[in-house]
């Protein structure tokens, strides 16, 4: 799971310790920020309408460092998200924390974080690794948030297959 998807995966693993044998989490934030939470509604509330403009979406897209050939899909998907849903996703993402049950997870979990990500992401990766008994952490050189699975899908799949073959 990547980012918000990774939070959902970790939540599932904390509730159902034997749901899977292997899992990958990439760029997952587990350090809650009440300040960020409080800023999301006013910030996105006032500028949400801009995402419908391609020029603005291109700026946003560029900041995410996603392969350029994925822009049309990104634009379509982003425009389809309602304002209230976008705010809810971002707010929940900003206050997520690991649950105690995560320590009982039976899956082998590979944790990836980009070398060029924010410190909070790197710290989150370490926290996840410390809480999960059977986990491995890898800092990906020269990569930003979510770049591994999105921009390097072939390498990502290779790593996934390596994890499965190890057992």
Predicted regions span which residues?
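C-terminal alpha-helix
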Residues: 155, 159-167
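Conserved alpha/beta-hydrolase "acid-adjacent" motif
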Residues: 118-124
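Catalytic histidine neighborhood in serine/cysteine hydrolases
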Residues: 125, 129-146
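Flexible "cap/lid" loop of the alpha/beta hydrolase fold
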Residues: 14-15, 19-50
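Conserved alpha/beta-hydrolase catalytic His-Asp/Glu region
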Residues: 34-36, 51-103
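Gly/Ala-rich beta-loop-alpha elbow adjacent to hydrolase catalytic centers
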Residues: 1-5, 9
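Short beta-strand/loop motif that positions the catalytic acidic residue
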Residues: 105, 111-113
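Catalytic histidine-centered segment of alpha/beta-hydrolase-like enzymes
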Residues: 143-155
């Amino acid at each position: 799971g990547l980012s918000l998807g990774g939070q959902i995966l970790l939540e599932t693993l904390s509730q159902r310790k034997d749901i899977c044998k292997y899992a990958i989490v990439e760029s997952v934030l587990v350090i809650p920020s009440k300040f960020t939470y409080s800023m999301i509604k006013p910030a996105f509330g006032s500028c949400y309408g801009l995402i419908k403009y391609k020029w603005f979406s291109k700026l946003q897209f560029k900041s995410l460092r996603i392969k350029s050939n994925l822009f049309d899909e990104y634009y379509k998907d982003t425009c389809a998200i309602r304002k209230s849903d976008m705010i809810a996703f971002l707010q929940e993402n900003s206050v997520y924390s690991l649950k105690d049950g995560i320590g009982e997870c039976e899956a082998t979990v590979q944790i990836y974080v980009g070398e060029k990500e924010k410190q909070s992401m790197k710290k989150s990766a370490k926290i996840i690794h410390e809480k999960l008994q059977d986990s491995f952490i890898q800092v990906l050189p020269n990569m930003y948030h979510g770049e591994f699975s999105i921009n390097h899908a072939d390498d990502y799949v290779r790593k996934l297959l390596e994890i499965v073959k190890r057992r």
